[in-house]
Regions:
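Hydrophobic "lid"/C-terminal helical patch
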Residues: 16, 51, 90, 117, ...
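Conserved alpha/beta-hydrolase catalytic His-Asp/Glu region
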Residues: 7-66
């Protein structure tokens, strides 16, 4: 189980893991242990504050067309928190963006498919560096 302890917070953390991870990763003990450690560091009160801050955050998509810098948008194909359609929208609004969709990943794509994400970031950095030279 995932969670920063037992009881209600442990149950919430477990349910959250089911929402942020690709179904194929729900039995990955190492990944679940990492999420449990992350949850433990934040604690129940911190977790609630994080969620409130995220839900209360202003919609800043209207700013994206004005950002004139290279951008890489990475999204897990099965991300339930930031669905692929939102990542596609974000990438389309940014003037110089590339979208990378990570298969067999949810919201935690960097933890679920680290080799794929790191390779994509390195390829993107090489392209950005080549353009600037």
């Amino acid at each position: 189980a995932v969670g920063g302890g037992s009881g209600a917070f442990g149950q919430v953390a477990q349910g959250f893991a089911e929402r942020i991870l690709h179904p194929s990763r729900l039995q990955d003990r190492e990944l679940l242990r990492l999420l449990a450690d992350m949850a433990s560091c934040v604690g129940g009160e911190g977790f609630v504050r994080q969620q409130q801050a995220a839900m209360g955050r202003a919609d800043t998509r209207n700013w994206l067309p004005g950002l004139h810098a290279p951008a890489l948008v990475v999204c897990g194909r099965e991300d339930q928190v930031t669905p692929l359609t939102l990542s596609q929208e974000m990438a389309s609004l940014l003037p110089d963006a590339e979208l990378v969709v990570v298969d067999e990943a949810g919201h935690m794509s960097i933890l679920e498919q680290p080799d794929t994400v790191v390779a994509a970031v390195l390829r993107w950095l090489e392209r950005v560096d080549a353009v600037r030279l």
